[in-house]
Amino acid sequence: MASLEDGTYRLRAVTTSNPDPGVGGEYATVEGARQPVKAEPSTPPFFERQIWQVTRNADGQYTIKYQGLNAPFEYGFSYDQLEQNAPVIAGDPKEYILQLVPSTTDVYIIRAPIQRVGVDVEVGVQGNNLVYKFFPVDGSGGDRPAWRFTRE
């Protein structure tokens, strides 16, 4: 499995069945510290709030930190609770597993490294919020949320 290089990226919401849906789309967008991370178009006023520093840690997991201007302190993808449809929060950066989607070079499933009996906890979109979704660990459960990582 290929690992993602450390760097700054924009994260576009896609799916495992349609990893390259064409122009447009929604991108992970910070609203502010301790606020839910949103999925917004890559246009003003959102564009400047869609840059993320992705760093691989020694254990092979990643942190996804907001890389925008004038951030008063470091925050990134985080959570208060890992329940079905709970929001991804811009908070103290947590670690995640990035799983490359087969037949792609830049599309990954973002999973929380939390053990839940029989399920994977993955980052998806509901409405215009990034949320945690549960999927069976056996790969069943249909189309999964994924993210295209585009270098800045």
UniProtKB/Swiss-Prot annotation:
Q: Which domain of life is it from?
A: Eukaryota
* Molecular function terms from GO: cysteine-type endopeptidase inhibitor activity
Q: Which UniProt keywords apply?
A: Protease inhibitor, Thiol protease inhibitor
Q: Kindly indicate whether the keyword Repeat belongs to this entry.
A: no
Which Gene3D superfamilies does this UniProt record tie to the protein? 2.80.10.50
Q: Which Pfam families match?
A: Inhibitor_I48
How this chain assembles, per its entry, is: Homodimer.
- So what family is this one in? Belongs to the protease inhibitor I48 family.
**What exactly does this protein do?**
Binds and inhibits cysteine proteinases. Inhibits most strongly papain and cathepsin L, more weakly bromelain and cathepsin B while it is completely ineffective against cathepsin H.
The protein in question is named Clitocypin-4/-3
Question: Encoded by which gene?
Answer: clt4
